[in-house]
Amino acid sequence: MIFYNSLSGQKEQFKPIEANKIKMYACGVTVYDDCHIGHARTYIAFDVINRYFKYRGYDVTLVRNITNIDDKIIKRANENGESTTELVERNIKAMHDVFARLNILKPSKEPRATETIPEMVAMIETLIKKGYAYQGANGDVFYRVTKFADYGKLSKQNLEALQQGSRVDVVEEKENPMDFVLWKMAKEGEPAWDSPWGAGRPGWHIECSAMSKKLLGNTFDIHAGGSDLRFPHHENEIAQSEACNECTFANYWLHSGMVKVNAEKMSKSLNNFFTIVEVLEEYHPEVVRYFLASTVYRSEINYSKENLENAKASVERLFNALRDIEPIEVNLPDDASEYEEKFIKAMDNDFNTPEALAVLFSLAKEINTLKTTNKYKASGYAYLLRKLCDVLGILFTDIEEYFKQGDGADASEIEKLIAERTQAKKDKNYARADEIRNQLQQQGIILEDSATGTTWKKG
């Protein structure tokens, strides 16, 4: 298995620290607002990778943190006239709800930053003792970036050039504009914890360093996050952790590509910013997940109506292949392994989901061909298609439920019309019964009558 390591800037053969085990950390959400489509992109990308590792037999420990104390959280809570706890709890629940709708697996561990304050304080104390950190005149503690010789190795940036082109706000207490805060002294009314430097709260960067150290150890296999976090967040994590622990922080770094909207950067100022809930009001979770998983994880992805409609058509092609056929493992044909090998080859090469999906469509085509000629063989291929779709986390909805929930006709209205048609038949008003059938047929709804009643599906 090879994949692109942002640290080295090239594809590398993956070698876990411990055979058959993977320790992976993914930077989680700062829960000051609703999750947006960019969050969905990042966490679906790493969910696919997590699922693939498990499919390949690895015992995966995935830690995905929650940043539940931050300047943005305090600011938003004050604006709303509520406590930070109320804001955080509501947004965590909303995050869990939308992630579940998108079929994102729960992480092995989901620490909140405030659960690891003692470990953060201990790391900061170590950094001060080693000369990597200092306390400013106002009480804040800062990291001394010039002390860390490898600063910039992840983002491939030179510290001297960064300093010259710095647009960082000049803070008098800092020795250098690039120095960043490790511990921030509390202002009146803000959440605070005791420390050797006075009551305050941790800086954002030290939170992830401490949580990963506590749950995965000083060195672990993979650190993941959105490409927007590469600098300064991930660069600062490396500086803190490697100075404190005197060893490599993470061996491999994975960064997911950003979402653009109609080829423009997504931002509230451009009025092209979408929350996950807003997107799911228009498109089924299956479609949204497929769309976000269909591009290589580290590439940019363009959010547009055309691309989502294409994703919808693709999802329906896969679902239609599995319609009216029962997946049966024991019926798996001997040559089915060829499809699985092609799927593995694609995913083993930097998690190439477009190529993996091409294999799934080849399988779907095979199933459709065999449905009328060899149902036994078709059912075996259907089992394999289901199995490989599960690796990508797609086709997680019941087939008929998906088509009932699809765009267009409302399910409750269809059920009312079916009930009216049933009554019309009882009353021997066959003209009205036929009229309803034709009306639904024009909406793409197919009725199937049986001794037990009438069922429907979208054609």
From Swiss-Prot:
ATP binds at K268. Keywords: Aminoacyl-tRNA synthetase, ATP-binding, Cytoplasm, Ligase, Metal-binding, Nucleotide-binding, Protein biosynthesis, Zinc. Binds 1 zinc ion per subunit. Pfam families: CysS_C (PF23493), DALR_2 (PF09190), tRNA-synt_1e (PF01406). InterPro entries: Cys-tRNA-ligase (IPR015803), Cys-tRNA-synt_Ia_DALR (IPR015273), Cys-tRNA/MSH_ligase (IPR024909), CysS_C (IPR056411), Rossmann-like_a/b/a_fold (IPR014729), tRNA-synt_1_cat_dom (IPR032678), tRNAsynth_Ia_anticodon-bd (IPR009080). Its EC number is 6.1.1.16. One of its GO terms (cellular component) is cytosol. Its main location: cytoplasm. A motif ('KMSKS' region) lies at residues 265-269. It is found in: Cytoplasm. Its cofactor is Zn(2+). SMART domains: DALR_2. Monomer. HAMAP family: Cys_tRNA_synth (MF_00041). This is Cysteine--tRNA ligase. The lineage of its organism: Bacteria, Pseudomonadati, Pseudomonadota, Gammaproteobacteria, Thiotrichales. The gene is cysS.
